[in-house]
């Protein structure tokens, strides 16, 4: 028996991990160019379908579920005596939305006009939204027509803009628009630029991971004819977040970030990324960079390295003490990380190989940066003992990651 995902560019998909956590079958990826040839195969029992084939597969089906007919696209196909297509994305989207907000009587704005947008429209209808507005790049109402949709109650991003590896891009900025809830179907990165704006404005929000897991559960029910509890959905969401999200450390130069990060990496399955060490490997001594090219140049390359690594997953990231002085580093770190500020009294801070201490006192640096460490971080730990601090951070991470 064969089950899997049909699509293109699937190496960053979580689908295999989700279906194998469900435990009913092995799951593989089918990156196919020739659909005619694929649908002639006789050894496939069930597939999920993703970009760019959700509409293209319809011509190969013998029948479709009512939801799939309404939406006009398919994400699940069961092969038996006939080939039947389903749309379980709508169930996943309903699950994601209903945990946070009741759409009944609300104005819903949907960004994008592709297959996922069609699913969002039908989901909003199912949940009895009062008004549904679709905004797109080339449609009748465009992203820049803010006055048309500025009073929306709920915003759903159904575009791929901001998805890995093109992180931190967004089709709109919140400001004039202040919905009561926002949903982004993207799940990699964990927080898109849009969702980080929501956090800043204290707007309830969620990414597409729950939608992805729930639609997979519904597909599994179709494949196996077994009923799966919603508790399984939340358990898988937590496992995926715990595995894939990063732990990032910020704090004063010499506060022990590298040591604590090394212990955390050793005690988890996460890979250690020490930003200062990578800079040294690529560009030479940090002391020399400060002395010859100056701090401004150093901050530029530091941000470049942070941007590169913080979009990846399953890491422990030890940042340099001054990483918080560059505003964009906040967004680099928070897209995939829980950020911890670790601290020590000035008397315990190490001065070794800390060029910033040659021109500034510890007190001056602390006065200039403490508010930045506070703004950048999700949690604070006083690093009296590296092993204890590492243990406490891992425990907190495992609790924090579920939301």
Language model region names:
Residues 335-376:
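A glycine- and Lys/Arg-enriched "phosphate-lid" helix/loop adjacent to the NTP-binding pocket
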Residues 7, 87-90, 97, 101, ...:
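Glycine-rich adenosine-cofactor-binding loop
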Residues 185-245:
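Adenosine-phosphate binding glycine-rich loop
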Residues 127-143, 276-283:
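NAD(P)-binding Rossmann-fold cofactor-contacting core
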Residues 141-206, 323-329:
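Rossmann-like adenosine-cofactor binding region
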Residues 277-325, 329-334:
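ATP-dependent small-molecule kinase phosphotransfer cores
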Residues 2-100, 189-191, 195-197, 201-205, ...:
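Phosphate/diphosphate ligand-binding glycine-rich loop within oxidoreductases
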């Amino acid at each position: 028996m064969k089950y899997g995902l049909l699509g293109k560019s699937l190496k960053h998909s979580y689908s295999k991990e989700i279906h194998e956590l469900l435990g009913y079958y092995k799951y593989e990826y089918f990156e196919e160019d020739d659909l005619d040839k694929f649908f002639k195969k006789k050894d496939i029992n069930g597939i999920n379908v993703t970009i760019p084939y959700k509409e293209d597969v319809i011509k190969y089906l013998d029948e479709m579920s009512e939801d799939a007919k309404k939406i006009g696209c398919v994400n699940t196909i069961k092969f038996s005596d006939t080939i039947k297509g389903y749309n379980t994305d709508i169930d996943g989207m309903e699950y994601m939305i209903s945990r946070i907000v009741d759409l009944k009587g609300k104005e819903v704005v949907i960004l994008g006009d592709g297959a996922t947008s069609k699913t969002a429209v039908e989901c909003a209808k199912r949940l009895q939204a009062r008004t549904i507005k679709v905004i797109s790049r080339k449609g009748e109402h465009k992203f820049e027509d803010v006055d048309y949709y500025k009073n929306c109650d709920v915003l759903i991003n159904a575009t791929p803009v901001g998805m890995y590896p093109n992180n931190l891009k967004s089709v709109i900025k919140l400001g004039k628009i202040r919905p009561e809830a926002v949903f982004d179907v993207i799940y990699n990165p964990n927080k898109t630029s849009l969702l980080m704006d929501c956090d800043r404005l204290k707007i309830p929000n969620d990414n597409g991971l729950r939608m992805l897991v729930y639609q997979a559960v519904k597909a599994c029910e179709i494949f196996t004819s077994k009923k799966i509890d919603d508790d399984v959905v939340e358990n898988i969401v937590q496992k995926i977040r715990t595995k894939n999200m990063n732990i990032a450390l910020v704090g004063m130069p010499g506060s022990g970030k590298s040591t604590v990060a090394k212990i955390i990496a050793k005690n988890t399955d996460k890979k250690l990324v020490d930003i200062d060490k990578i800079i040294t490997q690529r560009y030479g001594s940090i002391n020399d960079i400060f002395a010859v090219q100056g701090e401004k140049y150093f901050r530029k390359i530091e941000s470049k390295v942070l941007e590169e690594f913080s979009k990846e997953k399953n890491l422990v990231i030890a940042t340099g003490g001054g990483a918080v002085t560059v505003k964009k580093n906040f967004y680099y770190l928070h897209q995939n990380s829980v950020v911890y500020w670790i601290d020590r009294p000035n008397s315990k801070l190490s001065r070794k190989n800390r060029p910033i201490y040659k021109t500034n006192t510890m007190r001056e640096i602390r006065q200039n940066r403490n508010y930045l460490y506070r703004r950048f971080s999700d949690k604070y730990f006083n690093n009296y003992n590296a092993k204890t601090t590492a243990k406490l951070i891992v425990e907190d991470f495992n609790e924090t990651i579920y939301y």
